[in-house]
């Protein structure tokens, strides 16, 4: 059997996360060998480094427990900064970032799944976030102008991309000079077996 194409992988990921958003389902820690653990999203978030204050400050429906760490811990976000979140999902990290950068700061969430973007936009409107913008797009081709961001964050998303170098090329393009990145993700430390390469669930986190 041939390896899955880049298009196939994107389609699988888009469908998988679209179903999660549409079903209002809770996910699982993507670092758990691709098994969806049954804990609540809040418990998952607490276990991967989010404080109780962060969990309570963000809209509850934005937190689906899909991350594998807390990029906010290393982002050191400052007032008035512009932040881009790669693979923003329901908007959990974006809403936290919006509070930290304040009313004169700005947060842009990028996600390729229409259902996730719709969910995040509804939550943003419901909770009256005025400094957050959710955009539909692929992280390999960001719908953002050059030299836009002071900080780029991402939580367990880049591993889902079949073209990781393109992602980092885009990061470099949209970052301002002196900008920084804060990424929580999983990495491959040894070659996957042929059986694993054909397992669609692995490509979906």
What kind of region is each of these model predictions?
Residues 36-82, 93-100:
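Conserved alpha-helix/loop element of class I SAM-dependent methyltransferases that forms part
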Residues 127-140:
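Conserved SAM-binding strand-loop segment of SAM-dependent methyltransferases
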């Amino acid at each position: 059997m041939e390896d899955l194409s880049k298009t196939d992988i994107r389609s699988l990921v888009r469908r998988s996360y679209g179903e999660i958003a549409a079903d209002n389902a809770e996910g699982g820690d993507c670092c758990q060998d691709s098994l969806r653990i049954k804990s609540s999203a809040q418990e998952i978030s607490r276990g991967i480094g989010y404080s109780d204050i962060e969990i309570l400050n963000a809209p509850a429906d934005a937190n689906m427990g899909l991350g594998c760490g807390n990029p906010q811990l290393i982002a050191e976000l400052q007032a008035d900064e512009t932040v881009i979140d790669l693979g923003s999902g329901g908007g959990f990290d974006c809403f936290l970032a919006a509070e930290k950068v304040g009313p004169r700061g700005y947060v842009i969430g990028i996600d390729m799944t229409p259902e996730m973007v719709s969910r995040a936009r509804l939550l943003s409107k419901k909770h009256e976030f005025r400094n957050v913008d959710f955009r539909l797009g692929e992280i390999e081709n960001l719908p953002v102008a050059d030299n836009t961001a002071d900080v780029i964050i991402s939580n367990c998303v880049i591993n889902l991309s079949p073209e990781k170098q393109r992602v980092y090329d885009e990061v470099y393009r949209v970052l301002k000079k002196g900008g920084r990145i804060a990424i929580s993700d999983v990495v491959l430390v040894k070659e996957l077996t042929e059986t694993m390469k054909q397992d669609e669930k692995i490509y979906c986190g």
